[in-house]
């Protein structure tokens, strides 16, 4: 019994390590971009880790209302980074969490029938959106590589050397290691980079010593939420894109566990994700989605028991209650994070391209959908003021590359694929009716 629990515990720790880098990078990026204090940033990382555990347990615990019951780990989605920063800059932190709460409620409501809407989000749409997400995140990575936007030593050679050292370590680990070490290469790169940065005088431990030993979570840490239409629409789009990504993860895990997923299973999975997003907004954390890197770990270890993921969720919740653990993440220099971000966000772009590789580019319509959506998404990212003369209600939607590109991809897919398919079916039905009449 003891040996069995020890094995389950070790596997749970492996899953924590596999997703930990992704879990801490998002709050660090968003928190620094919104100008949070060290104390607030420590809380943001702590609550994010805690809520990752809660979200994971909600999904693993399958009941009649929610939970898909697969060995899936949930973490904060990279899709939300740019929109959260944009909303925070325009409306303030309270509106960020108001829009997350609203998007969580929306996901819960549409979970009953979202499985029927997946046809509106084929690979040509999701691949374009994921590619745009990666592209729009790259400026954040590059700014951090140089030392962080607005820093006194921005672009200093020491920052660039540190960032490229971290990136090189990650690349080498991917090339020359296998299995679990390969799956945590980004975390190892960050740890080694921070160790090197300490000897360069770029790491200060004051944040760790000042942090509380234990801190209970509290709702609305940053104040009462505010609600505005444009941010709600933006975060709702983010939530829907995350659902589409999660659907792929669910089916991948279904194949690994030899389980055929039904529409009811998917609905419960979506509902658990919506509940996680809602709680993330209430406790001032993040929107959550299924982490694909943990799917790779399930495949690697061959262990498909939900008990392992339950242990993972409990460990994450425990970590979130100790701010000193979160404070350690705040000492990571921006240049170290920047080097890791290039690999992480570059992988997002590569994953989007991989999704696009599954579509039929012999159809000119698909080429045009990708061209227009990625083109507009990138264009708005590079020239965010292009639509500033529009009414204020539309400004946030049109000055965010992810939203602009996503909207373009969805609309063009409906025009070229959904309507044309419906028209073709109607024509075939008319033809069949004519033949019957003859």
UniProtKB/Swiss-Prot annotation:
The entry assigns this protein to a family as follows:
Belongs to the nucleobase:cation symporter-2 (NCS2) (TC 2.A.40) family.
The name on file for this protein is: Xanthine permease
Pfam families reported in the protein's UniProt record: Xan_ur_permease (PF00860)
Q: Could you tell me which PANTHER family the record lists for this protein?
A: PURINE PERMEASE C1399.01C-RELATED, URIC ACID TRANSPORTER UACT
Q: What sections of the protein cross the membrane?
A: 11-31, 41-61, 65-85, 100-120, 121-141, 154-174, 180-200, 220-240, 272-292, 308-328, 331-351, 367-387, 396-416
The places in or outside the cell where this protein is found are: Cell membrane
Which keywords accompany this UniProt record? Answer: Cell membrane, Membrane, Transmembrane, Transmembrane helix, Transport
Superkingdom as given in the UniProt entry:
Bacteria
Its cellular-component GO annotations read: plasma membrane
Query: PROSITE patterns annotated for this entry?
Result: XANTH_URACIL_PERMASE (PS01116)
Q: Which GO terms of the molecular function aspect are on file?
A: xanthine transmembrane transporter activity
Q: Answer yes or no on keyword Cell membrane.
A: yes
Biological role stated in the UniProt entry: Transport of xanthine in the cell.
Q: How does the entry describe its membrane topology?
A: Multi-pass membrane protein
Which Gene Ontology biological process is one annotated for this entry?
xanthine transport
């Amino acid at each position: 019994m003891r040996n069995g629990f020890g094995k389950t515990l070790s596997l749970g720790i492996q899953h924590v390590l596999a997703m930990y880098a992704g879990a801490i990078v998002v709050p660090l990026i968003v928190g620094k971009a919104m100008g949070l204090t060290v104390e607030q940033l420590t809380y943001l990382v702590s609550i994010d880790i805690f809520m990752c555990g809660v979200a994971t347990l909600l999904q693993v615990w399958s009941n009649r209302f929610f939970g898909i019951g697969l060995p899936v780990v949930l973490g904060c989605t990279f899709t939300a980074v740019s929109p959260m920063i944009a909303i925070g800059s325009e409306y303030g932190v309270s509106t960020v969490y108001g829009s997350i709460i609203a998007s969580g409620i929306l996901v819960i409501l549409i979970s009953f029938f979202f499985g029927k809407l997946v046809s509106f989000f084929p690979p040509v749409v999701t691949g374009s959106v994921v590619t745009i997400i990666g592209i729009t995140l790259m400026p954040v990575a590059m700014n951090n590589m140089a030392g962080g936007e607005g820093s006194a030593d921005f672009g200093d050679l020491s920052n660039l050397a540190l960032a490229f050292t971290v990136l090189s370590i990650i690349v080498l680990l991917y090339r020359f290691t296998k299995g679990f070490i390969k799956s945590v290469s980004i975390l190892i790169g960050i740890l080694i980079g921070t160790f090197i940065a300490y000897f360069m005088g770029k790491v200060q431990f004051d944040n760790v010593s000042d942090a509380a030993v234990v801190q209970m979570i509290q709702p609305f840490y940053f104040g009462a939420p505010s609600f505005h239409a444009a941010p709600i629409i933006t975060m709702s789009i983010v939530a829907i894109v995350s659902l589409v990504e999660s659907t792929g993860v669910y089916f991948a895990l279904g194949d690994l566990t030899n389980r055929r997923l039904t529409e009811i299973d998917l609905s419960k999975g979506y509902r658990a994700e919506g509940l996680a997003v809602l709680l993330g907004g209430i406790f001032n954390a993040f929107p959550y989605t299924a982490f694909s890197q943990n799917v790779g770990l399930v495949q690697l270890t061959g262990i498909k028991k939900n008990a392992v993921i339950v242990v993972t969720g409990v460990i994450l919740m425990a970590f979130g209650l100790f701010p000193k653990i979160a404070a350690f993440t705040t000492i990571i220099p921006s240049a170290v994070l920047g080097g890791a971000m290039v690999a992480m966000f570059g992988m997002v772009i590569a994953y989007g391209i991989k999704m696009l590789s599954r579509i039929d580019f012999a159809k000119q319509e698909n080429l045009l959908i990708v061209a227009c959506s990625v083109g507009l998404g990138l264009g708005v990212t590079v020239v965010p003021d292009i639509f500033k003369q529009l009414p204020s209600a539309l400004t946030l939607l049109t000055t965010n590359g992810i939203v602009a590109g996503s909207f373009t991809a969805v609309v063009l897919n409906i025009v070229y694929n959904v309507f044309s398919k419906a028209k073709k079916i109607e024509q075939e039905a008319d033809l069949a009716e004519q033949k019957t009449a003859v």
